Amino acid sequence: YVEPYRTDIRGLATYTIPRWDVQLAATWISVPGEYLEANFVADNAWIAAGPQPLGRALTGAAVATVNLIPPYTMFADRRNNVDFRVAKILHIAGMRTQFGVDIYNLMNTDVVTAYNQTFVPGGPWLAPTALQPARYARLSLEIAF
């Protein structure tokens, strides 16, 4: 199987408002979701008693992992993220100082970033195991001398 072409899209914009010496910046990223699997762990007991018995035990290992869906046919949701920054620029005693606030995940999306890809009949296949971090802010101070 050949992995299909999937596009990452990224953008960055910055602007300094000259009259107020305020710097604005935003980044945007759009990343396709990972491809999903349904990994089933078949052991010797299941192979011997399964719907189509193999008629012998597995050779060399007590278990075999089988992906039940063809590769690159199921994908997770695309992840979009916007980050924003605003900073005030001050010139004090010949030094350039910036007081800033960075806001990550501005739209507060809660996209699933990882799934349980182990298939167990009646089990938690595709249950989320990780989410994109929630919106948060960071204060910053930069002094250039």
What kind of region is each of these model predictions?
Residues G11-Y15, A26, F84-K88, V101-I103, ...:
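Residues on the lipid-exposed face of transmembrane beta-strands in outer-membrane beta-barrel proteins
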Residues Y5-T7, R78-V82, M95, P133-A137:
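Residues that define the transmembrane beta-barrel architecture of outer-membrane proteins
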Residues G94-M95, N108-V112:
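Short active-site-adjacent structural elements
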Residues M74-A76, V111-F145:
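C-terminal beta-signal and terminal closure region of outer-membrane beta-barrel proteins
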Residues I17-R19, W28-E34, I103-T109, F145:
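Transmembrane beta-strands of outer-membrane beta-barrel pores
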Residues W20-A93, Q98:
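Extracytoplasmic gating/loop element in the C-terminal half of outer-membrane beta-barrel translocons
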Residues Y1-P18:
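Repeat-solenoid scaffold signature
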Residues Y1, T14, P70-M74, A127-T129:
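Outer-membrane beta-barrel proteins
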